Curated annotation (Swiss-Prot):
This is Peptide methionine sulfoxide reductase B9. SUPFAM superfamilies: Mss4-like (SSF51316). Its EC number is 1.8.4.12. Binds 1 zinc ion per subunit. GO terms for biological process: protein repair; response to oxidative stress. It is found in: Cytoplasm, Cytosol.
Length: 143
């Protein structure tokens, strides 16, 4: 079933579950990354080299997060995007201020980090470095 590219993110924090409920629906690796703020191994993610047309949603709650049109190859070893679907993610500064943690606005699942000012030739000069295991890809079928 095609996914709408104009999907609107639900209100902040609207998906809340207990750890036992998250464990029931997530793989152990998804739980470690999304709920415990882990990081998957560099270059091993399912979506690192995928550049098909579609939508990347939160693996925890299915909130649409990124359009494939904002994905680029940064060479960092994780899927990279230069912008998110408006309202879909939250950015929280980390100690030192060099990067921001990004989480799903709906379920607070850890996605990865945003680094700014690296000089990539994108519209925002931002790199949203996202764990593949935090994402679920849905292809947009062309008719």
């Amino acid at each position: 079933m095609p996914t709408s590219a104009t999907a609107v993110a639900p209100s902040t924090g609207s998906v809340q579950k207990k750890d036992q409920d998250w464990r029931a629906i997530l793989s152990p690796e998804q739980f470690r990354v999304l709920r415990e703020k882990g990081t998957e191994n560099r270059g091993k993610g399912e979506y690192t080299k995928l550049f098909d047309d579609g939508i990347y949603s939160c693996a925890g709650c299915a909130t649409p997060l990124y359009k494939s049109t904002t994905k680029f190859d940064s060479g960092c070893g994780w899927p990279s995007f230069f912008d998110a679907i408006p309202g879909a993610i939250k950015q929280t500064p980390e100690a030192g201020g060099r990067r921001m943690e990004i989480t799903c606005a709906a379920c607070d699942g850890h996605l990865g980090h945003v680094v700014k000012g690296e000089g990539f030739p994108t519209a925002t000069d931002e790199r949203h470095c996202v764990n593949s295991v935090s994402l679920k890809f849905s292809e947009i079928s062309s008719q």
